[in-house]
Every structure is written in structure tokens, then in C-alpha cells.
Amino acid sequence: MYCQDSNICAVFAVQGGKVGRKHGIKRGRRPSIRSPAQRARGPWIHESKHPAFAKQQINLEMPNSRATTELAWVCSSTSRKKKWARSLTLSTAPLSPPPSLVHCEDCSCLPGCHSGDLYNLAPAERTC
């Protein structure tokens, strides 16, 4: 409560716990932390349910960034995981050697390829 630096508070919590300051800090902090936590838990759970499903649907429908592709890869089924693993290995491997795969990275052979996403690169490399 009276600490200004987080480092000092950590030192007091670790070293001073044996003396009895740790128990005093716990008693003082617990009610102050619990009451906002209980208040925040109710609405936070309801708010997090709907965006969670929305995020999963968005990630599965439009995987654009690396974070969304990882989330969609985790949320998908085991059969999809194998396809994702294959597509990721295909998209990361042909950076240097075969010219046919490098040619397909430009989306010239697949009309459905909009931008250079990992999700769209893998089918382009497979079809070519």
C-alpha cells in the first residue's frame, strides 16, 4: 500500500513474508482485489462469450495475419490441423529453391488468390 516502486513491493512480499508482513499485505489486499474482481467477473464473462465465438468465426473465415491463422489452426479439427501443417510447411519451404513454386507465390496462376496470405499461398502452390 505504501510502496511506490514495484521492485520494493516484490522484495517486501518475498523477504518480509517470514516476518509477518506478507500476511498483513494479504489481508489488506484480498478484500480490495476481490470486490472489483467479483464485479468485473460477471459482465466480463458475458462480454467475453460473444466476442470469443465471433473471433473464432472470423479467424476460420478470414485468416489474414499470423495470429489469426494460429488461432484458427488451434480451433480447427484434427483433419484440418494436418492440412494446416502441410500448407504451412509448403508456404515456408519454397522461399528459395524451385522456380515453379516461387512463380505461384505471385498469385498469377490462381485467380482466387487476393493477397500474399499463408492461407491463400498454400492452395496456389498445390495447384501449380
Curated annotation (Swiss-Prot):
One of its GO terms (biological process) is double-strand break repair via homologous recombination. InterPro entries: DUF5543. Pfam families: DUF5543. One of its GO terms (cellular component) is proteasome complex. Residues 22-42 are annotated as: Disordered. Residues 22-32 have a biased composition (Basic residues). This is Putative protein SEM1, isoform 2.
